[in-house]
Design a protein with these regions (language model features):
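A short glycine-rich, His/Asp/Glu-containing loop-to-beta-strand
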Residues: 90-128, 134, 183-185, 189
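Ligand-binding loop in jelly-roll beta-barrel domains
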Residues: 99, 165-191
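Short acidic-glycine-tyrosine-enriched beta hairpin
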Residues: 149-164
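Residues within helix-turn-helix
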Residues: 31, 42, 60
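A short, N-terminal "cap"/entry segment at the start of jelly-roll beta-barrel domains
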Residues: 56-112
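Recognition helix of helix-turn-helix/homeodomain-like DNA-binding domains
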Residues: 38-54
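Glycine- and acidic-residue-biased ligand/ion/polar-headgroup-sensing regions
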Residues: 132-150
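Short basic helix-loop element that most often maps to the first helix and adjoining turn
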Residues: 17-34
Length: 198
């Protein structure tokens, strides 16, 4: 891929600015990026202006349209081996004051599942998105509303929802407490799949 921004430049060059610079470098409009990423034009504009932060899956979708690896915009922990220890997993975020993540899956030849633990603050709403693959939400603590193709599902601790990611979906922590969710999906949210996609 072409020259990629250094994800460590976050403070000097915020995510939105770097995304806008790359979009302009490619001569793409906001609409072209939005359509390609399965997001709204308004949402892409808000990311570029630093008004909102994308979820991990939305950032991956935008990075793909911009012909970049998500690692160009976000430093994520690598998973060495197939085991992660609860007291050793780093917590990371796309931007300050957004969702935080703990990577719990590894990468190896042929793997198709990716998984993270998501810590969602009270009142947080994710943007509606549709993309390839499938995913599952399993609520570990708290509660969250997951909307899939217009159908709202309130999930509490112990509840799960499995659906094709090609259906427009979003989530919302409708409570006044943080929620913790195990997310499992086939989208390469880490950007470390082998080049052939396997």
């Amino acid at each position: 891929m072409t020259s990629q921004p250094d994800p460590r430049d976050d403070e000097a060059n915020p995510l939105g600015v770097r995304l806008r610079e790359r979009r302009r470098q490619l001569g793409l409009t906001l609409k072209e990026v939005a359509v390609g990423a399965g997001l709204s034009v308004g949402f892409i504009s808000q990311i570029e202006r630093g008004i909102t932060a994308p979820s991990l899956s939305s950032l991956v979708s935008v990075a793909r349209v911009l012909n970049m690896d998500v690692g160009a915009f976000l430093s994520q922990p690598r998973a060495e081996g197939g085991i992660t220890r609860h007291d050793e997993r780093p917590v990371y975020a796309v931007s300050p004051n957004s969702l935080t993540y703990e990577r719990i899956s590894a990468s190896f030849p042929g793997n198709v599942l990716r998984s993270v633990i998501i810590h969602e603050p009270p009142g947080h709403r994710s943007e509606p998105i549709a993309h390839e693959g499938e995913e599952m939400f399993y609520v570990l603590d708290g509660a969250v509303t997951v909307e899939v193709a217009g159908e709202r599902n309130v999930l509490e601790a112990g509840d799960s929802l499995h659906f094709p990611s090609t259906r427009i979906h979003s989530s919302w922590n409708h409570t006044d407490r943080p929620s913790t969710i195990l997310w499992i999906g086939t989208m390469d949210v880490f950007g470390d799949a082998p080049p052939d996609g396997s």
